[in-house]
């Protein structure tokens, strides 16, 4: 798949087959994460945590549903793998750099999943719930001084990707000449 086609085809997938993510596909997704730009070259201050534990994902699902006041919902969408992006906590002047870098890492993983025909979805609610549930956060065993910044669910799906027309004016544009 070419880059522009992947961009036009990418969408949030919320249904998964129940199959595990293959080691080969995970390796490709992690390689895409490592290809992302990181502000000021601070790659050594970024960290990825791959969660394949069904028990952890169910606990995160429950915590997220409670936090969102939607008990009975499944905000992890039964995804088989969640990849958390964390970074070393920075002084406030640099925090935006790490947040932006984590977003780029997450987006690279989503685009790689799209290219591989896998489903992927940003899991912002899950990120918030895990970040605010000490028992779940501790299970991630993040490096000392690191905080969660992004979460991506990824796995096999029966859904297909179709390129869509992207309106050129979805985001307003201004300029200075």
What are these regions (language model features)?
Residues 1-81, 175-177:
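N-terminal amphipathic, basic helical "cap/leader" segment at the start of enzyme domains
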Residues 53-58, 89-91, 158:
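Short, charged/polar surface micro-motifs in flexible loops or helix N-caps
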Residues 82-86, 152:
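Active-site-flanking beta-strand signature of metal-NTP-handling nucleotidyl enzymes
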Residues 40-43, 74-77, 140-146, 164-165:
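Solvent-exposed alpha-helices and their adjacent loops that cap or buttress functional pockets
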Residues 33, 83, 90-136:
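Small-aliphatic-rich amphipathic alpha-helix that forms the alpha element of a beta-alpha
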Residues 11, 87-90:
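Short, histidine-centered active-site or binding-site loop motifs used for metal coordination
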Residues 6-13, 17-20, 142, 147-177:
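C-terminal helix-cap and adjacent tail motif
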């Amino acid at each position: 798949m070419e880059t522009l086609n992947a961009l036009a085809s990418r969408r949030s997938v919320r249904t998964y087959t129940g199959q595990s993510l293959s080691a080969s596909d995970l390796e490709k997704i992690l390689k895409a994460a490592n290809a992302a730009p990181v502000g000021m070259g601070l790659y050594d201050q970024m960290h990825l945590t791959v969660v394949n534990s069904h028990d952890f994902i169910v606990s995160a699902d429950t915590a997220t549903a409670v936090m969102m006041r939607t008990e009975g919902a499944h905000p992890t969408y039964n995804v088989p793998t969640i990849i958390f992006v964390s970074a070393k906590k920075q002084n406030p002047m640099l925090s935006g750099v790490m947040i932006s870098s984590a977003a780029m890492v997450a987006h690279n993983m989503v685009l790689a999943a799209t290219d591989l025909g896998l489903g992927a979805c940003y899991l912002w609610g899950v990120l918030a719930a895990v970040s605010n549930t000490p028992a779940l956060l501790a299970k991630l065993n993040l490096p000392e001084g690191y905080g969660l910044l992004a979460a991506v669910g990824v796995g096999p799906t029966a859904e297909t990707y179709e390129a869509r027309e992207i309106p050129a004016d979805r985001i307003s544009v201004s300029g200075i000449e």
